[in-house]
A protein has these predicted regions:
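Fungal secretory targeting signals
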Residues: 1-34, 61-64, 71-72, 510, ...
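Aspartyl protease catalytic domain
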Residues: 21-36, 146-286
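Signature of the N-terminal lobe/flap region of pepsin-like aspartyl proteases
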Residues: 34-163
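Short hydrophobic beta-strand that contains or immediately precedes a catalytic carboxylate
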Residues: 57-65, 72-73, 294-298, 304, ...
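Conserved beta-strand elements of beta-rich interaction domains across eukaryotes
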Residues: 68-69, 180-182, 222, 235-239, ...
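Extracytoplasmic, non-cytosolic globular domains
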Residues: 237-238, 248, 290-335
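Aspartic protease catalytic domain
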Residues: 344-489, 496, 500, 514
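C-terminal membrane-anchoring module of eukaryotic surface/secreted proteins
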Residues: 445-605, 612-613
Length: 614
């Protein structure tokens, strides 16, 4: 069987009709997926049909961006209807492993072995997954190009457990986009080499070779009509705006130093009593004042931060913490809800731009992208939520953040991973493919205006005099200049100049009259002042009161009143904090064992043998 598979691989390389001389653009599904999105996914075909070698078996949609193994949901996932009578995973497609002649699920003798156990899914365990899974290899076909021996983890059954202990079914698998190695090798005596879709196309792609072992991606937004973009061996430059962060990766993860999170307004008035508020990351937790290392991970859905940080963000929003889900639900009846979501309001994430820590880069995420929807089976009716999940697990910026950001990596030659601002729904989305060079990797941003890609979506609020900036790092992004004057302004200047000239003339005339009067009356009072001086007697108000009425008025004339100003209250509205939760403990990677809390019984972990997998 092994020899046949290798012969089949060589044969298929010769029968390819499509030629790719540059980066390979992936195809995105026309559907969107939940139950906490909507999210976008790419289409691939897994396995090969035994009756017709050229017809793969199962088309599935996968969330792209993982590293090392791809996680594929099997059709047997729908056998368990205890969680839900509806198999939501069927919408994205399931892999029927029984019909694939190229599947190998026995050669790799390493965990997971096909028994029930905790399963790593991304880089946070805030919503742990318990599954019956095992290692395997099989073919994956992308746009007519078959890729053999792809590293997989097949999931026969499983669920995810939310903070209330309720279990919910899995719905969409993940597509690995490589690792720091071209292959993942298993075994000591007999070595088994597995591959990844982009490493194979780079190393053995033949006529479909891509220029580098890399990718560039912007997952976009299904709800706002921002199409997804994924290129293997390159990137779409129109999805990269402005400066680009370049960081070292750690194994298959993308760590970066997050310095602060602030709230801002791109233009117009603010839904708050201020236009900018910073230091929200460390609010309530001074240990975060110097920043926090987070991991950017497209396979996890939410923004996972310490509890104090999520609470600080929530305190500025009309949201309520829901402990059953570990998420914040929007109060859609609050007038602030529509103001915030439709105006140019955003969260700004300030990062270290590079490993030298001598520059920053800011990624802005409009609140319109942070108005996501929970659907069945998580909730009975669609519910809007704010995707910050408090966690003591590894802090992660997942798909909710990456709707507004470009992410990419060049795996080889001491490569780097990249982060940049991505455009909004008013961008042209005309693909401008750029190559990631093999030995001199870099990503260049476009000169497009980020604000312009959102103007059609936003309705700026009227500006008020009570708005101010708040925080020590208040941004000046909202300052504007206008060199042109309207007709009304010009007329106002002319009228003002005329009035001002008349006022100056009146002052001069008044001064002359007063001066003449003073000269006339000075002689009549000369003797009196002389007498007072000779007697060396101090004058007082009583003596001066004997002067003439006109002279007394001149000597005691009051200056014109000055215009007075009152400073009103600039304090904004206050919001009740979410219910108090447990304090944040030291972050770590330790995972707790998770017992079943759902309305069904788990199979005994020791009761499932390897033979039952097949």
């Amino acid at each position: 069987m092994k020899h046949f598979r290798y012969a089949f691989a060589i044969f298929t390389l010769y029968v390819q009709t499509s030629v790719c001389t540059g980066p390979r653009q992936m195809t995105w599904s026309t559907k969107s997926f939940g139950p906490d999105g909507p999210w976008q996914a790419v289409n691939v075909i897994v396995g090969s049909n035994s009756s017709d070698l050229m017809q793969p078996t199962s088309e599935v949609a996968l969330y792209p961006g993982g590293s090392w193994e791809s996680k594929i949901l099997l059709s047997s996932l729908c056998d368990n209807q205890t969680l839900s009578p509806i198999c939501y995973a069927e919408q994205a497609g399931l892999f029927n492993s029984d019909k694939s002649m190229t599947l190998d699920n026995t050669s790799i003798q390493l965990p997971p072995y096909g028994t029930w156990d905790d399963l790593e899914w991304g880089y946070t365990n805030a919503v742990p997954i318990y599954a019956r899974a095992r290692r395997a290899t099989d073919w994956i076909n992308i746009q007519g190009t078959p890729i053999p021996e792809v590293d997989l983890i097949l999931i026969r059954a499983g669920w995810q457990t939310y903070p209330n202990g309720q279990a919910y079914p899995l719905e969409v698998g993940t597509l690995s986009l490589g690792s720091p190695e071209l292959n993942q090798t298993f075994g000591s005596t007999i070595k088994i080499n597995t591959t990844f879709v982009n490493s194979y196309l780079y190393d053995q792609g033949g006529v479909n070779t891509i220029p580098s072992y890399s990718y560039g991606m912007h997952i976009g937004s299904a709800s706002l009509g921002i199409p997804g973009s994924l290129h293997l061996g390159g990137y779409d430059q129109s999805r990269v705006i402005g400066e680009v962060s370049s960081q070292s990766f750690n194994s298959g993860s993308f760590p970066i130093q997050l310095f602060d999170i602030s709230l801002g307004v791109a233009e117009g008035g603010s839904a708050w009593s201020y236009s900018n508020k910073s230091e929200l990351l460390a609010q309530g937790n001074s240990s975060l004042s110097s920043g926090l290392t987070v991991i950017v991970d497209p396979t996890n859905p939410y923004i996972y931060l310490p509890q104090s940080s999520c609470d600080a963000l929530a305190a500025e929003l009309p949201v309520t913490y829901q402990p059953d889900y570990g998420l914040y639900f929007w109060d859609t009846s609050d007038p602030q809800y529509n103001k915030i979501l439709t105006s140019p309001s955003y969260l700004a994430f300030r990062f270290s731009k590079n490993s030298l820590n001598n520059a920053d880069i800011t990624i802005k995420v409009p609140f319109a992208l942070l108005n996501l929807t929970l659907e069945a089976p998580l909730v009975e009716t669609p519910t809007q939520y704010f995707p910050c999940m408090p966690t003591n697990s590894t802090p992660v910026l997942g798909r909710a953040f990456l709707q507004a950001a470009f992410v990419g990596v060049n795996w080889l030659h001491a490569g780097k991973w990249y982060l940049a601002q991505a455009p909004g729904p008013d961008a042209s989305f005309i693909v401008n493919t750029a190559t990631m060079d093999e030995k001199n990797p870099s990503v260049s941003g476009s000169a497009s205006s980020w604000e312009d890609t959102w103007k059609g979506q936003w309705v700026p609020l009227p500006e008020t005099s009570t708005e101010k900036t708040s925080g020590t790092d208040a941004s000046n992004d909202n300052s504007t200049s206008d060199t042109g004057l309207s007709t009304g302004a010009k007329i106002g200047i002319i009228v003002g100049s005329a009035v001002g000239g008349a006022l100056v003339l009146a002052i001069i005339i008044t001064f002359c009259i007063r001066h003449r009067r003073k000269q006339t009356s000075s002689q009549s009072h000369e003797d009196m002042y002389k007498m007072v001086d000779d007697s060396s007697t101090k004058t007082n108000e009583g003596e001066l009161a004997e002067l003439s009425v006109s002279e007394w008025k001149q000597l005691n004339e009051l200056a014109p009143d000055r215009e007075r100003y009152e400073i009103g209250s600039e304090r904004g509205p206050f919001y009740e904090l979410a219910p108090e939760k447990k304090p944040v403990t030291e972050l770590g990677n330790n995972k707790d064992a998770h017992s079943q809390c759902g309305p069904f019984e788990l199979p005994d972990r020791s009761s499932v043998s390897k033979s039952q997998w097949i």
